[in-house]
């Protein structure tokens, strides 16, 4: 199925994992203490694709799911949200990945994953829908797909094909340390593709992890700059975000809400940003316009924290604009 959102809009193709998050029905308890869980579709790249589509953009997802009930359910959720699913493969031998999420009382999360191996890890380069990837105006990805072969080779091939076709490359490492063999391997692989990206978004926690510096300031952020980068973003949770280009840098405050679950907030932020720039990359060169885009992205991220689960909480364009209007009033 192809996306039905405006065919004249540029396509955002998101590559990587899609999985089921099991979110506890109460906050502030351990997994063993939780009395029940809500089944919530997730996976950062898939979240970004749906975030773009919810906001009226065109999005596609490339990845691999298990040929099981959960896998077909997830593909159906993409279709229901007008995300092109022609880049999906199904694996008959491996299951769809699962993650059990512990919600702290402040809405922050801890994860326990079931995926050794899961279907997303088994995507091969020869299974890629290259025609779909070549049609991307923006190609977005994370780092979880770099952890093991054959998915790592598929990731590298997809990135290369998208770049050669003229796509803007967007990278959100989305660090999940328990999935990596060691912190050192995580840093090495995350940084191995760093200089390929045009846009990079990291959280304050990821900035500290990658640099080894506990001080979150401009100097620390700029240590991750590379010459071909167009935009570096550092998200700071309730403190908004910082932005860096070759010509200017600054910060944009976020909106204070009663956070229930921070799952998907960063993906909502990224989706909003990509949807705003996919057809007009000159935004990246004009600070005032970029600040407006980032304010909108911050609003989308904030809205996403007010509900449990990532995908159910991603806002529509109307919801985000209504939220911003209330903030002004």
UniProtKB/Swiss-Prot annotation:
Entry GO MF terms: ATP binding; fructokinase activity
Annotated InterPro entries: Carboh/pur_kinase_PfkB_CS (IPR002173), PfkB_Carbo_kinase (IPR050306), PfkB_dom (IPR011611), Ribo/fructo_kinase (IPR002139), Ribokinase-like (IPR029056)
Recorded catalytic activity of this chain's protein: D-fructose + ATP = D-fructose 6-phosphate + ADP + H(+)
Cellular-component GO terms for this entry: cytosol; extracellular region; plasmodesma
Keywords, ordered alphabetically: ATP-binding, Carbohydrate metabolism, Kinase, Nucleotide-binding, Transferase
Keyword Kinase among UniProt keywords: yes
Enzyme Commission number, as recorded: 2.7.1.4
GO BP, one annotated term: starch biosynthetic process
CDD domains from the UniProt entry: bac_FRK (cd01167)
Keyword set includes Lipid biosynthesis: no
Family assignment from sequence similarity: Belongs to the carbohydrate kinase PfkB family.
Entry function: May play an important role in maintaining the flux of carbon towards starch formation.
Official protein name in the record: Probable fructokinase-2
Organism field: Arabidopsis thaliana (Mouse-ear cress)
Phylogenetic placement of the source organism: Eukaryota, Viridiplantae, Streptophyta, Embryophyta, Tracheophyta
